[in-house]
């Protein structure tokens, strides 16, 4: 394990500045005294776009590549046309750094309300393929603006891309107590891509005899996520289905305000990026109202990815305890929550 962490910090837009500041405080408190934390802040997002017209240049990628990991606050602002920052920054970074595993833990934490009846046991992880499917930009339009307009959006699925994300999901399932893995797709209709996913899922599964597996159509999965969320342990799925069901998973486990995520390059060839699922929330930016818990839980994912398991667990335990103690109490500011969690983590 490296005894230093060289971290790229991207506060981004809106509340990103506020929540990332709290995440860094907790990160510093969690690290052992002999681990040196070095950070470099990058000004990406709406402000830079308006000033320069740039989102993410090749020189930016070269600079980011020198770091061990990336912590992102939020990217997005209503002053920028829709899709400009998403494609020009987020997707460009994902493809450039081969972040082919999008990791989304979904756990109902103490003191957090779920819209589901009762208080079901919710503790699973979605492993979403991040660099293929219909998000590769493979498509086009003709006869645009006419009654005969045609648009195509091609879903790209390769055996190489599928196998590596499926293998990652099996390894994560193997490491969890329940050792269960579900493949979610729609292979009865999307027969070409669906059968490729299914065949590779079954073949890789032969190497993981301790992992119990099942296949589930995506429409059935959305039902079971609501009616039987406790049946899930690890889910692996493609880019599009993963984009949809991870938001449903966040909704049933307390909302995106406490949802963390990681965009992972498991090989370590490029730094992985960790971020809260919530957006930039420009309507409350600068008011101290943003809850930094999702960012702080993303810091825990970052530490676990870098090999600091005990420190990651300590952060998660601190957030759980803090959430449990909030019930029935007045809302606190962003700084107050961050300060309280920093004290808990520091011990």
From Swiss-Prot:
Cofactor: Mg(2+); Mn(2+)
GO molecular-function term, one example from the UniProt record: magnesium ion binding
GO cellular component: cytoplasm
Cofactor note: Binds 1 Mg(2+) or Mn(2+) ion per subunit.
Keywords: Amino-acid biosynthesis, Branched-chain amino acid biosynthesis, Cytoplasm, Leucine biosynthesis, Magnesium, Manganese, Metal-binding, NAD, Oxidoreductase
One record GO biological process: L-leucine biosynthetic process
Pathway(s) this gene product operates in, as recorded in its UniProt entry: Amino-acid biosynthesis; L-leucine biosynthesis; L-leucine from 3-methyl-2-oxobutanoate: step 3/4
UniProt similarity note: Belongs to the isocitrate and isopropylmalate dehydrogenases family. LeuB type 2 subfamily.
Protein name as it appears in the record: 3-isopropylmalate dehydrogenase
Species name: Streptomyces avermitilis (strain ATCC 31267 / DSM 46492 / JCM 5070 / NBRC 14893 / NCIMB 12804 / NRRL 8165 / MA-4680)
């Amino acid at each position: 394990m490296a005894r230093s962490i060289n971290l790229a910090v991207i506060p981004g837009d809106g509340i990103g500045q506020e929540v990332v500041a709290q995440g860094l405080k907790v990160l510093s408190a969690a690290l052992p005294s002999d681990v040196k934390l070095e950070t470099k802040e990058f000004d990406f997002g709406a402000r830079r776009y308006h000033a320069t017209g740039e989102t993410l240049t090749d020189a930016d990628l070269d600079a980011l590549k020198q770091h061990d990991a990336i912590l992102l606050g939020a990217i997005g602002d209503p002053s920028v046309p829709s899709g400009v920052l998403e494609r020009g920054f987020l997707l460009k970074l994902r493809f450039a750094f081969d972040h082919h595993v999008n990791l989304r833990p979904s756990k109902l934490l103490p003191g957090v309300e779920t819209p589901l009846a009762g208080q079901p046991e919710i503790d699973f992880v979605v492993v979403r393929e991040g660099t293929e499917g219909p998000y590769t930009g493979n498509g086009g339009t003709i006869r645009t603006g006419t009654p005969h307009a045609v648009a195509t959006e091609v879903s790209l699925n390769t055996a190489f891309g599928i196998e590596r994300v499926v293998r990652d999901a099996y390894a994560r399932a193997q490491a969890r107590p329940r050792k269960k893995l579900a493949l979610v797709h729609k292979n009865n209709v999307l027969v070409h891509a669906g059968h490729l996913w299914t065949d590779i899922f079954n073949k890789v599964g032969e190497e993981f005899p301790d992992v119990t597996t099942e296949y589930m159509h995506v429409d059935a999965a959305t039902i079971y996520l609501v009616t039987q969320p406790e049946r899930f342990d690890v889910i692996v799925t493609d880019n599009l289905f993963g984009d949809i069901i991870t938001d449903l998973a966040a909704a049933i486990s307390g909302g995106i305000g406490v949802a963390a995520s990681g965009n992972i390059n498991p090989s370590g060839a490029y730094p992985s990026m960790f971020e809260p699922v919530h957006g930039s929330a420009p309507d409350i930016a600068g008011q101290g109202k943003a809850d930094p818990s999702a960012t702080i839980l993303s810091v825990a994912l970052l530490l676990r990815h870098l090999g600091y398991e005990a420190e990651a667990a300590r952060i998660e335990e601190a957030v759980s305890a803090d959430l449990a103690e909030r019930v029935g109490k007045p809302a606190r500011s962003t700084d107050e929550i961050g300060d309280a969690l920093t004290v808990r983590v520091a011990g």
